[in-house]
């Protein structure tokens, strides 16, 4: 395990969320739900409350040299079974640089030290970059399922949709995408 002195994470606070407004934007219609669209103070406060007041959840910001470049979530924390659902969102300006993998290495080590035994996550089939990262970290694919596509309707005229057409299904004029559950056994595989 490498040490990354330029990368760190800590518990999220409201002041952190105001910096998310300065992040880049995903251009691909496949990833629009990852764009931080809240602009007003009221909307940002509501977003923070919505995320951090969920029971059995924890949120952390990702920092690179003190600049906030993303966040991590732990949801559905089960203290008895010592498992939780992992989420990660990066400022699009910091994607494809290996940062996601590096911060996840640090975060998974932290979770193991906290006594977590199993971490699971969900990834859309079309999010090949993320799936490759998770597999490199030792996550195993468990099963696939259909979910309502969160970013509008399928449009085969757009290259991102066309190149990933096997990831989508239209049912009763509604767009669904395939996603998968993946998990990592921290005791055995980390």
Describe each region flagged by the PLM.
Residues 3, 22-38:
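Helix-loop element at the rim of GNAT/NAT acetyltransferase active sites that forms part
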Residues 7-22:
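A short beta-loop-alpha structural element at the N-terminal edge
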Residues 14, 37-95, 104, 175-189:
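Acetyl-CoA-dependent GNAT
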Residues 76-78, 145, 149:
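A short acidic/small-residue loop/turn micro-motif
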Residues 96-110, 132-136:
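Conserved acetyl-CoA-binding loop-helix of GNAT-fold acetyltransferases
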Residues 110, 121-131, 147-157:
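Conserved beta-strand-loop-alpha-helix junction that forms the acyl-donor binding cleft
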Residues 117, 147-190:
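C-terminal "cap" of GNAT-fold acetyltransferases
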Residues 135-145:
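Conserved acetyl-CoA-binding loop of GNAT-fold acetyltransferases
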